Amino acid sequence: MKETAISVLALLTLFLLEVVSANELSLPFHLPINETIGLEVFQGINNASPPSPSPLPYPQCGMKKGGGKCIKTGECCSIWGWCGTTNAYCSPGYCQKQCPGPYPEGRCGWQANGKSCPTGTGQCCSNGGWCGTTSDYCASKNCQSQCKLPSPPPPPPPPSPPPPSPPSPPPPSPPPPPPPSPPPPSPPPPSPSPPPPPASPPPPPPALPYPQCGIKKGGGKCIKTGECCSIWGWCGTTNAYCSPGYCQKQCPGPYPEGRCGWQANGKSCPTGTGHCCSNAGWCGTTSDYCAPVNCQAQCNTTTLTSPIKNRMRGIESFMLNVV
């Protein structure tokens, strides 16, 4: 009877081995590798470790999603690329697209939820999100929408050549002496001087500086010590650059446990743990963190299969001893 029970147990274990090998799935319990102890293989059922936390959702909108928009009415696109309706998505400093407004006069483009410059004024919307008419706003490298440089005036026509002078006539015969002329009339009073021309209009205000760092500048960093890169891509040291919600890179920290990548100023996952840094900026060991399509740094796909292979070798050795 005892030998029959062991045979049934061996067949059940072989069946589990085939299922796990075919699907490359991790078991819901820990099987110890021990070739001398029989039924202790299944003691790991009571010591099952909890699953690792799911990574945060990947970006859904804005600069992190190719300029995509939120679908539901009333949702705002946050600076991290996620959609929602609370202050963490819609309030100033946290919203990058589909924000509730209002916006300052002269604002335009994605920085003002797609607002356009006034029509008929010849204004262009610059990369910085401001309206203007100079090349700082309208040149192709500086413009994000309504890009149209005014055409230069046509050149003046070349001067026409002077007409040919006619041949000089023969000298006339001397005229008879003129009669005595009356005294000349007195000259008219001088006309009043014309009014001065109107003053020229003031020059237009200069354009804001172009982005210097972060995702608006190809991942560039601020140069000066202590400067933070704001969500708009400019460098500075005040709260408008360094405080949470306004800082995207070179922020003073601290960062939550498990954060990594550009979302945590280039912070790495702990070494020697097999953790990968996901596109969302969190550390983990599953394919949600380590697969090439999901990983931004410390991408190590070997950690996905090696624990399963070690468990399979232990089960195989145990089955050979039992049978």
Curated annotation (Swiss-Prot):
The modification 4-hydroxyproline is found at residues 50-51, 53, 55, 152-159, 161-164, 166-167, 169-172, 174-180, 182-185, 187-190, 192, 194-198, 201-206, 209. InterPro entries: Chitin-bd_1, Endochitinase-like_sf. Residues 154-203 are annotated as: Disordered. Residues 151-206 are annotated as: 10 X approximate repeats of S-P-P-P-P. GO terms for molecular function: carbohydrate binding; chitin binding. It holds the Pfam family Chitin_bind_1. Residues 1-22 form the signal peptide. Sequence repeats lie at residues 151-159, 160-164, 165-167, 168-172, 173-180, 181-185, 186-190, 191-192, 193-198, 200-206. Heavily glycosylated with beta-arabinose on hydroxyprolines and with alpha-galactose on serines of the extensin-like domain. As no other sugars could be detected in the native lectin, it is unlikely that the three putative N-glycosylation sites are actually glycosylated. GO terms for biological process: defense response. Glycans are attached at residues 50-51, 53, 55, 151-198, 200-206, 209. Chitin binds at S78, W80, W82, Y89, S230, W232, W234, Y241. Keywords: Chitin-binding, Disulfide bond, Glycoprotein, Hydroxylation, Lectin, Plant defense, Repeat, Signal. PANTHER family: CHITIN-BINDING LECTIN 1 (PTHR47849:SF6). This protein might function as a defense against chitin containing pathogens. Binds to several branched or linear N-acetyllactosamine-containing glycosphingolipids and also to lactosylceramide with sphingosine and non-hydroxy fatty acids. This is Chitin-binding lectin 1. It comes from Solanum tuberosum (Potato).
